[in-house]
């Protein structure tokens, strides 16, 4: 059995670790609430832009934006991979990276090369180790996603698709469900399908009569770019909310495990102390009997 001094040292070390994980749990809980608020605040904008784009598309069926046209025959696909910059968030990054790797392999089996955009340091490191072609990246977003930081990296993918150099663009991220559950999502961002413009709100699929300045094509072009950017921003906001939730849960589990270890070490310490006292008493009794 280890000595009492050694056990006391272990107890002190685990107690210090538990203080750190407990503090990180509280910080993550605070950041999680703010991240959820940002995530929910971003949804109405994306929904409104989608609704307007749907009405305008029905009002101008003769015009097809490049985002709505499939680039058949192109042997290169795009992938926007959203991960975190930091670790200590459970299996959140591992799950999305594993799913992305599977998607890479599926595309390669179909004869497609992949050009990737990394949002987040963990994804960038993975893509570099994997040997993927990274055409744009953005890292160190902090706790608040800013669209102006994302636009440059995302625009690289959008421009390549508009020029007919990509067959499709996929978006991989972690969707926030609730505090205890997050889902890995890989969805097709481009070309935009009719599903993107389904209202699903019970309203009839009518066309509104708009007055365009300068013209319908220019408005639709700008609107669809804004819509796709909003989808990416929403994915980043969902990923950040998922990150803080996963980190809070992971740090709580670490704190609980530390508490269990401390209890076990305390029990071991008490046994060692009891054995030492018993030994001393035995020696005293033995000495008295000898006299």
From Swiss-Prot:
One example of the protein's molecular function in GO is: ATP binding
**Could you tell me the Gene Ontology terms of the biological process aspect for this record?**
proton motive force-driven plasma membrane ATP synthesis
Q: Where in the cell is it found?
A: Cell inner membrane
**GO CC annotation terms, alphabetical:** plasma membrane; proton-transporting ATP synthase complex
Task: Quote the Gene3D superfamilies the UniProt record gives.
Answer: 3.40.1380.10, ATP synthase, gamma subunit, helix hairpin domain (1.10.287.80)
Where does it mainly reside?
membrane
Keyword presence, Nucleotidyltransferase: no
Q: Which UniProt keywords apply?
A: ATP synthesis, Cell inner membrane, Cell membrane, CF(1), Hydrogen ion transport, Ion transport, Membrane, Transport
Record's keyword annotation contains Ligase: no
Database matches in InterPro entries: ATP_synth_F1_ATPase_gsu, ATP_synth_F1_gsu, ATP_synth_F1_gsu_CS
List the membrane topology term(s). Answer: Peripheral membrane protein
Tell me the SUPFAM superfamilies matching this sequence: ATP synthase (F1-ATPase), gamma subunit
Q: Which CDD domains match?
A: F1-ATPase_gamma (cd12151)
Q: Which domain of life is it from?
A: Bacteria
The Swiss-Prot or TrEMBL record describes its family as follows: Belongs to the ATPase gamma chain family.
Subunit-structure text: F-type ATPases have 2 components, CF(1) - the catalytic core - and CF(0) - the membrane proton channel. CF(1) has five subunits: alpha(3), beta(3), gamma(1), delta(1), epsilon(1). CF(0) has three main subunits: a, b and c.
Function description: Produces ATP from ADP in the presence of a proton gradient across the membrane. The gamma chain is believed to be important in regulating ATPase activity and the flow of protons through the CF(0) complex.
What is the name attached to this protein's record? ATP synthase gamma chain
Q: Which organism is it from?
A: Burkholderia pseudomallei (strain 1106a)
Species lineage: Bacteria, Pseudomonadati, Pseudomonadota, Betaproteobacteria, Burkholderiales
Q: Which gene encodes it?
A: atpG
